[in-house]
Amino acid sequence: MDTLFNSTEKNARGIPQAPFIENVNEIIKDPSDFELCFNKFQERLSKYKFMQESKLATIKQLKTRIPDLENTLKICQSLRNHSDEGDESDEPILLHYQLNDTLYTKAQVDIPEDRADLKVGLWLGADVMLEYPIDEAIELLKKKLADSEQSLTVSTEDVEFLRENITTMEVNCARLYNWDVQRRQDLKQAQEGTKNLKI
């Protein structure tokens, strides 16, 4: 039975493939091993469910983060494009931006004459904000956006893989449980049959 869980089949992130039980009698040779076997299957099932919950939380976080990165990138590109146009008027840019889900506000941005002086402040997380030249900020945002989209793709693939394995393990647990119920019924009938024998 231990060889059943030592499968070398794994997905790209190392999550092991769930075994499928076709014949319970091949797995459980001795009925006294049922509890151990059933507990191992239940344990693996709970591990898959935990991994799935973790991946779903990651997906939720990424689905919130990606639009924020896209909006920030769009604003930075807009600032750079405005400074590239070389607008001769020294009028500041008037921007409308989102503070939170339901609140928007306006900002007035003065564009420096030298584009090299154009800098933006980016929140990096954990209450840290750094000032970057506009070109570096755009490159950083593009990289973070690409990484986040890649992580979303990977996490979505993992959730689908885990969903399939959870279903397989639930079927395995049901087969084991039904096998044990049938074994107990057969044992009970055999005992009742021996009681009725008259010698």
Curated annotation (Swiss-Prot):
PANTHER family, per database record: PREFOLDIN SUBUNIT 3
Keywords: Acetylation, Chaperone
Role played: Binds specifically to cytosolic chaperonin (c-CPN) and transfers target proteins to it. Binds to nascent polypeptide chain and promotes folding in an environment in which there are many competing pathways for nonnative proteins.
GO-annotated biological processes: microtubule-based process; protein folding; tubulin complex assembly
Note: Present with 6550 molecules/cell in log phase SD medium.
Cross-referenced InterPro entries: PFD3, Prefoldin, Prefoldin_subunit_alpha
Taxonomic superkingdom: Eukaryota
N-acetylmethionine carried by residues: 1
Pfam families assigned to the protein according to its UniProt record, in alphabetical order: Prefoldin (PF02996)
Stated family: Belongs to the prefoldin subunit alpha family.
Description of how the protein assembles with itself and partners: Heterohexamer of two PFD-alpha type and four PFD-beta type subunits.
Protein name: Prefoldin subunit 3
Gene Ontology CC: cytoplasm; prefoldin complex
GO molecular function, one term: tubulin binding
